[in-house]
Amino acid sequence: MLDYFFLLAFCDVYSTETFWYHFFLKSFINDANPPLGFFFLPKAALADFALIKLFPSSDESPESSESDSDLESELESDTESELELESESELDSSSLLEGAFVCDFSFDLEVFSFTSGMPLETRSDNELKEGRTFLGRS
């Protein structure tokens, strides 16, 4: 089993102009800094949530793997219910949330907020070597 997991997602953020954002979470594995965990897309982009892949750590027991499966199915059902609520109401561009947050296994939280006109924040080489996140746009 892989000792890290990542989430790769494609989403369409509907605003005055439509952009395809490609979020990719890179994992850096070392002893001092555990690998990165997961990120969540903006609520407005849930309709285009494409792919979740979870790889439990090799030191986890089968029981914890089952709970991960339960958590994943719970996440999917929550996403479906939110989608139903959003489809019932009309959304205009001023009401959409744009941004994402990234969380690692030590639960340090970094918030990235951006609009289509602003460049995304990038990290220096040293921060990448230390296992920090890099959030990019294709």
Swiss-Prot record:
Biased composition (Acidic residues): 60-91
Region (Disordered): 57-94
Free-text disruption phenotype from the record: Confers sensitivity to dithiothreitol (DTT) and sorbate.
Note: Partially overlaps NET1. Disruption phenotypes caused by deletion of this gene may also be a result of a defect in its overlapping gene.
This protein's name: Uncharacterized protein APQ13
Naturally occurring in which organism (per UniProt): Saccharomyces cerevisiae (strain ATCC 204508 / S288c)
Gene: APQ13
